[in-house]
Amino acid sequence: MRKLKSFTFIALTAFAITACSGSKDVEQRPEQELYNVGQTHLQNGDYSQAIRYLDAVRSRFPGSSYSEQTLLNLIYANYKTQDYTQTLVLADRFFQQYPTSRNLDYVLYMAGLTNAALGDNYIQDLFRIDRATRESSSIKAAFANFQTLVQNFPNSPYAQDALARMAYIKASLARHELAIAKFYAKRDAHVAVANRVVGMLQQYPDTQATYEALPLMQEAYEKMNLNDLAAKTAAIIEANKGRTFAEIEKPAEPEGLLKQ
């Protein structure tokens, strides 16, 4: 047992020495070398090592000629390692440090993808009634990121994909609202049904889910003896009869995200 402890101690000591020497190695390398090694790891898909070296560039050489590109690469590398919180922290730092950069559209796009990834669990749980009142700040933040990108950089290479993702988010949130309206309808919560569908008409007027929610609103008004409102809703349904909506699929994970 004593020998085993001895060998364990030696192994742990060796590991500690190796770890320290590795850390020292990064600390002592010149900027150009750190940056180049980080870029090599990035190109090879070794994102954790890329972050290690690029973080050293950023912390040891602030304000250098590599600073902006290093921050862009760190945003990408942290996104790829699914450290979404850090990705958003770095994106916010980029907006503050480089408010006039020609890469703002890229950072907005990456922020949108990151917030969308954080909101994925929300979208997957859209029809869980026990979560009916839950708000998702992440998925709405993603929509805002993409919307800002499209409005401010309409000619950006990321604009078309951002539009597609906005459409998907909008359709998903509308389906969620429809599920909630159906939930209330089954419980004869007529006021809640009407209010929910009115909100859908305001926020998601051009979606399949909103059109499908209109009969629920008409029925709710009828049961509350609000006949004028029920008739107006029926007229809207009739005016949109036969209208078709394109099926919106979730956009695939984009390729070529590394900003050179």
From Swiss-Prot:
Q: Can you locate the S-diacylglycerol cysteine lipid attachment residues? A: C20
Q: Where in the cell is it found?
A: Cell outer membrane
Give the membrane topology: Lipid-anchor
What does the entry list under GO cellular component?
Bam protein complex
**A Pfam family assignment:** YfiO
Residues in the signal sequence: 1-19
SUPFAM superfamilies, A to Z: TPR-like
Q: Where would one find coiled-coil regions in this protein?
A: none
**Classification via InterPro entries:** BamD (IPR017689), BamD-like (IPR039565), TPR-like_helical_dom_sf (IPR011990), TPR_rpt (IPR019734)
Return the similarity comment.
Answer: Belongs to the BamD family.
The name under which this protein is listed is Outer membrane protein assembly factor BamD
Organism lineage string: Bacteria, Pseudomonadati, Pseudomonadota, Gammaproteobacteria, Pasteurellales
